[in-house]
Amino acid sequence: IPHFHDTEDRLCQLRASAQADVCGRVREAGPELDFIFSREQELGTLCRMQRSGALPLRVTHNDTKLNNVLLDEKTGCAKCVLDLDTVMPGLSACDFGDAVRFGASSAAEDETDLSKIFLRLDMYRAYLEGYLDACGHALTENEICVLPLGAKIITIELGMRFLKDYLDGDIYFKIDRPT
């Protein structure tokens, strides 16, 4: 999937959708667009580091959440990884970040009460410890340093994808409640 976690490209796509405003939703989405575009420099950090050679490409899953792991019913141990259609070269920080986005959240992905959604630091620390125990020996110092940034960027990147789709008329992410 070309440019899947290319946050700079996602920013360009979002900007184009905002400029086109085909559904007349930009005014309503103004605060969200301001939030994202005011962080543009930070959001491009991983892309710039990869282009400069500071971060290597790895084999990544790109949809690292618990429901993409088949667990043994008796032992609870992982049997295999599922949903392999997004496996491709990518950054370790993106896989780690996506796992944290999903697994260290205080609420389900589709929670509508925003006051219930926050990062569970205990779960974040557990993810970080487990990730480094399992593969830290294979990561560069730069990769380890940007793992926290990966969690932030991937979370905002997914928000950008949702926002772009909203501006475009809810084409990819189907919704079942008022916008």
Report each predicted region and the residues it spans.
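ATP-dependent phospho-/nucleotidyl transfer catalytic cores
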Residues: 1-61, 66-80, 153, 174-178
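A structural signal for short hydrophobic/aromatic patches embedded in well-ordered alpha helices
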Residues: 36, 127, 146-147
